[in-house]
Amino acid sequence: MSEKLANKINDKIEKLPRFSQIADKALIAEKERSLSGEPSEDHGLHDPKFAKQILQMTNFTTYGFAGNRAGSFETEAFLGEDVLRGVLLAFSLREFVDRELHAYGLGKGEFWEHSMNCALSAWMIATKVAYDDLEMAFVAGLMHDIGKVILDEFLSEEREKFVDITSQGYVTPVEAERTIFGVDHAEIGAQVAAHWGFDEKISEAIRCHHEPELAVQDPDLVTIVHLADCISVSLGLATQEKSLIGLLSSDFSGLGL
C-alpha cells in the first residue's frame, strides 16, 4: 500500500466519531425511557419485543426461528443481558452500517442484514459450544466486516479492476483487495475497532476472520466468527464473497463442533 493511500485511510479512520459518541445517543434514549417512570421491563435491554424486532429485520427465520417456534424469541437464553447489550450496540451502529456499499455490490440494507445475521450466527455457535462470552461473540460477528465501510470509498475508484480480478474465479475478493491496495477490509476493520476502543480480542476476530489459523489471543472467538460468516454467506445473505465458502476451515474440533 502506498504511503499516500495509507495516510488517506488512516485519516478517514481518525475522523470517525468515537464509538462513545455513537452509543451515547442510544444510552441517553434508554435513560430517558427509564426516567419516564414506566416499567423497565417494557423497554430497551429487557424488552422481548426489542430482541424480536432485530430478528425480524433479518432473514433469521432461515435458522429455524419461525412458525410455531416463534416463542424462541422470548427464551431466557436469547434474552440474556450479555446478548441484549450487543443488540443495543447493533442499534447504535445501524446508522453507520446501514448503507449502500457500491464497490462490493451491496444495496442499502444488505450490509446491515449480513452483519446482523453473522452476529446472531456467532451468538448461536458460541451458545452451542459454551463459549464464555456471548456478548463478545455477538459484537465480533456484528463488526467483522466493518472495514468495508471505510474501504468502499477507495475501492469504488478501482471498481472496474476489482470486478475484473474477481470475475476470473480463482481470486477471492479479499485477495483482490490486497492486490489493489496491499491491505484488506479485515485489517482496516481491526483498526476501526481499535480506534473505537473495543477489546483486543474483537480486533483480532475482525482481523483474522478470513484466516482463523492466524489467531493468537482467542482462537475460539476467531473461529466462531469465521464459521458464522461462512454460514451467513452460504445461505445467500451476502452478494459478495461467495468464494469464501471454499475457504471454510475443516478443523473445528477445538470448538466441539
Sequence positions of predicted segments:
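Conserved alpha-helical "signature site"
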Residues: 1-163, 167-246
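Short, intrinsically disordered, charge-balanced linker/junction segments flanking boundaries
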Residues: 176, 252-257
